[in-house]
Swiss-Prot record:
Belongs to the universal ribosomal protein uL16 family. This is Large ribosomal subunit protein uL16. One of its GO terms (molecular function) is structural constituent of ribosome. Binds 23S rRNA and is also seen to make contacts with the A and possibly P site tRNAs. GO terms for cellular component: cytosolic large ribosomal subunit. It comes from Limosilactobacillus reuteri (strain DSM 20016) (Lactobacillus reuteri). Disulfide bonds: none annotated. Keywords: Ribonucleoprotein, Ribosomal protein, RNA-binding, rRNA-binding, tRNA-binding. Part of the 50S ribosomal subunit. The gene is rplP.
Amino acid sequence: MLVPKRVKHRKVQRGHMRGEAKGGKTVTFGEFGLQALDSHWISNRQIEAARIAMTRYMKRGGKVWIKIFPQLSYTSKGVGVRMGNGKGAPEGWVAPVKRGKVMFEVGGVSEEVAREALRLAGHKLPVRTKIVQREEVGGQSNEK
């Protein structure tokens, strides 16, 4: 699973995810991509589940690019613990994904296989998604 090797701060504040993604909105490596239509935290387990779903459907043919990384820790306190007494222990790792971000890319397989693999991966994620295709000239993604 994806986890950072080393972090500067073990516990981080949640913050807000407002607006659209600034970068990473186009398909750059493969021919097809999976774009987020909502903003959400995506855990390392969800990223791994989506990756496994894609590679199994493609029967290990082609190539998958994961363009998000779970860099923030999230914390939670125990079940029977009262309020106060500091922040809870780190539970896992999440990748903040804003709307418009291309999270996964696929290349080296036919269009039907790529679309179905990305559709299966989208079902593993907590955001609404759409499949975008790389444009030949401008490199911009469009919905097909």
